[in-house]
Amino acid sequence: MTGYTAHGGFGRLNYSISVPDTAMTQKQMEEKFMGKYTELQREAYEANMQIPAQHLALYTWGNVSAFDKAAGVFAIKPSGVPYPELTPESMVIVDLEGNVVEGKLRPSSDTPTHAVIYREFAVSDGAKIGGIIHTHSTYAVSWAQAVKAVPLFGTTHADHIQTEVPCTPYLSREAVQNDYEKETGNLIVSHFRSLKLNPNEVNMVLVGGHGPFAWGATADKAVYNAAVLEEVSHMAMNTLQINPSQQPLPDYIINKHYMRKHGPNAYYGQK
């Protein structure tokens, strides 16, 4: 033990006390007594609890994961557990091959899809993705069931992405029978690459016949993007009910709204 030693006495009683000169940091204490992935689990838990709070899914119809790129793992909601029963400790730690690293429960059945997106977009392509969400929110699912991209009709949409929200085709019979959830991730990745879409700029997608996935720099930001997707899906549907022949917003308005928030000379908000 390093440190200093104090000596003293009282009458015939002598004592010697050794005091260490180092102390564990708060993070070290948490890792020792609370688990190595405590913070990652907390981030995933808090994001998952936003699904019912933001009305993005009923019952257990959605999941969020939080990614630690340096460690090569992510924390994700356990399969089939109702949101009120979740705790930070119930979040399952999984590696990028889908193997459980820590946790007593089975991870979400959508775990392989999350793993593919992290592996291909965040690791291989270098996209700034720290969280992914999948839900069955009503309006986004409606567009997915129609196998239609969400048109960019207005500035609310353009404030977030400069394109329509892409929708993949259906998975093939072979893909569904082979490895359904993994192939869902592969379909998303191949669809983006075929359209030359940048996952840093287009952070949401619909899977044909299935539903929405969204991602962001953090798990919380992924939830925000999923809420945006649901809202613009609703707005687009209403727009077509009012005017079935409505055309997309002109490019010059799209570019203005997107760049004022995300461009090199962005001026929206407090900086």
Model-derived regions, located:
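Extreme N-terminal basic, low-complexity initiation segments
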Residues: 2-5
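Glycine-rich flexible loops
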Residues: 17-19, 25, 29-271
